[in-house]
């Protein structure tokens, strides 16, 4: 079995299990966190959503909102996590079809059946473990998943070719696979929002992008990001989840929490935006 060791434990999150658990509980209880590990359901069924991937001390309280919301719907069999490939390593659209990833909480196994279904539906995706070797955007979701849900599997997908056409093709391939899989799966887009501008600028730019996400308008999201120079590192993964949501009949999106790194660090001159957004029906 291929075992991926943590790349950012001790940097983005604590490397000891007890300290990591305390950090996640800190995130839940934080002033801008959800305050509870389980939130009331919106509608009847959730697909998943958008979740940030910065260091837990910055984005953990916002990330906790999505996981607490999903906990209200019950545990899935599997998470599919689409993240940006920040390093441009490996295939333009990469998947791992087998193996496990290790965190301080233990191993999370890849769902080989679902990974194979996704890969069979999209000829451009490549089974490429190297693409994930340094990438944090997917790794940082796993301790949250392990804290909230026991004995679940996952499928990692990393994307550096973040075009609208690629995003749509990937979203449709995932939707087709989920219809064939016929078990509960949560689909996540791991993304931060605007980068390295003052708090007020980041909030204003993020609001424009979030508005398009809530409208389930993936083309509009790419348009406003381009026209207003909104640096959303996971815009492709977000667009793919929007497309999958529409394909699968999840026509509602709710903003659970929006904040910036300035809200957690107190430093507001150069900030990064974070949002937790839920797709449901």
From Swiss-Prot:
One Pfam family of this chain: Memo
Q: Which family does it belong to?
A: Belongs to the MEMO1 family.
Q: Which NCBIfam families match?
A: AmmeMemoSam_B
Protein name listed in UniProt: MEMO1 family protein Pcal_0028
| Source organism of the structure | Pyrobaculum calidifontis (strain DSM 21063 / JCM 11548 / VA1)
**Source taxonomy:** Archaea, Thermoproteota, Thermoprotei, Thermoproteales, Thermoproteaceae
């Amino acid at each position: 079995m291929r075992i991926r060791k943590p790349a950012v434990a001790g940097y983005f999150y604590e490397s000891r299990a007890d300290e990591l658990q305390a950090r996640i509980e800190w995130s839940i209880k934080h002033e801008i966190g959800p305050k509870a590990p389980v939130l009331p359901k919106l509608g009847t069924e959730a697909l998943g959503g958008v979740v940030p991937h910065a260091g837990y001390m910055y984005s953990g309280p916002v990330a906790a909102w999505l996981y607490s919301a999903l906990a209200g719907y019950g545990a899935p069999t599997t998470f599919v996590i689409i993240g940006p490939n920040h390093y441009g390593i490996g295939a333009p659209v990469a998947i791992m079809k087998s193996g496990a990833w290790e965190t301080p909480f233990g191993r999370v196994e890849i769902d080989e059946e679902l990974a194979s279904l996704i890969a069979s539906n999209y000829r451009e995706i490549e089974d490429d473990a190297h693409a994930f070797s340094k990438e944090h955007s997917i790794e940082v979701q796993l301790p949250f998943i392990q804290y909230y849900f026991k004995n679940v599997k996952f499928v990692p997908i990393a994307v550096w070719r973040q075009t609208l056409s690629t995003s749509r093709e990937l979203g449709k391939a995932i939707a087709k696979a989920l219809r064939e899989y016929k078990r509960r799966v949560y689909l996540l887009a791991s993304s931060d929002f605007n980068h390295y501008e003052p708090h007020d600028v980041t909030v204003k730019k993020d609001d424009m992008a979030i508005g398009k996400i809530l409208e389930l308008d993936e083309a509009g999201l790419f348009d406003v990001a381009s026209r207003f120079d909104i640096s959303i590192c996971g815009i492709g993964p977000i667009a793919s989840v929007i497309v999958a949501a529409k394909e699968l009949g999840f026509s509602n999106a709710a903003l659970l929490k929006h904040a910036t790194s300035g809200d957690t660090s107190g430093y507001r001159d150069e900030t990064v935006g974070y949002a937790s957004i839920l797709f449901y029906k």
